[in-house]
Amino acid sequence: DGPAQKQNTVNQLLVLIYLYK
């Protein structure tokens, strides 16, 4: 569950940056 949660957070960050761009 740890790694999966971390990947989810990274994905969310990428999406945020993509939207912010």
Swiss-Prot record:
GO terms for cellular component: extracellular region. The keyword Transport applies. Its main location: secreted. One of its GO terms (molecular function) is oxygen carrier activity. It is found in: Secreted, Extracellular space. Hemolymph. The keyword DNA-binding does not apply. Keywords: Copper, Oxygen transport, Secreted, Transport. Hemocyanins are copper-containing oxygen carriers occurring freely dissolved in the hemolymph of many mollusks and arthropods. Belongs to the tyrosinase family. Hemocyanin subfamily. This is Hemocyanin subunit 4. The lineage of its organism: Eukaryota, Metazoa, Ecdysozoa, Arthropoda, Crustacea.
